[in-house]
């Protein structure tokens, strides 16, 4: 199993709670560039008022507005895969910087480890190859739509 994912999950499970004062450590400007290269084919960032902050018009992936600190698999109106719903809605997976990085770099592998289920699947097949890009994308999403 990917050692990065195991390391992240161990740290996440050791943490007692998600702090309200969370932040992102990446470069949001570089994250905007990476988001526009790697994420816009599937995702948008649209406010609750309907203002599009990023992306095109794709709806194959969920709206990523306010993803930082949100429960995984819980955006209203999007049909998530069963494994992600179980991880987030049923087991409380929150998109912290660490969990976001681990997930976007290997969605299926992350869910298999998090759920301890070899049959876990992810609807997201794309993988962000570079950790730095994933960190920067999280910083960008945090900046334009943090709760």
Task: Please place each PLM-identified region on the residue numbering.
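Positively charged n-region of N-terminal signal peptides that target proteins for export
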Residues: 1-4
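Electrostatic cytochrome c docking/interface patches
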Residues: 17-36, 46-54, 60
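C-type cytochrome heme c attachment motif
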Residues: 33-45, 62-66, 101-105, 123-125, ...
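A generic structural signal for secondary-structure junctions
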Residues: 9, 47, 69-72, 105
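Axial heme c-ligation environment in periplasmic c-type cytochrome domains
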Residues: 50-55, 76-99, 105-133
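Short, solvent-exposed mixed-charge patches
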Residues: 146-147
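Bacterial N-terminal signal peptides
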Residues: 6-15
């Amino acid at each position: 199993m990917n050692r990065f994912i195991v390391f992240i999950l161990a740290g996440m499970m050791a943490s007692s709670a998600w702090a309200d004062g969370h932040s992102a450590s990446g470069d949001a400007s570089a994250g905007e560039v990476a988001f526009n290269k790697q994420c816009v084919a599937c995702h948008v960032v649209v406010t609750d008022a309907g203002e599009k902050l990023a992306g095109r018009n794709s709806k194959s992936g969920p709206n990523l507005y306010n993803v930082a600190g949100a429960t995984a698999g819980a955006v209203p109106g999007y049909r998530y895969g069963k494994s992600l719903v179980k991880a987030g809605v049923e087991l409380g997976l929150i998109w912290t910087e660490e969990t976001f990085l681990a997930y976007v770099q290997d969605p299926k592998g992350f869910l298999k480890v998090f759920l301890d289920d070899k049959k876990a699947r992810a609807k997201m097949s794309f993988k962000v190859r570079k950790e730095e890009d994933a960190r920067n994308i999280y910083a960008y999403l945090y900046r334009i739509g943090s709760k």
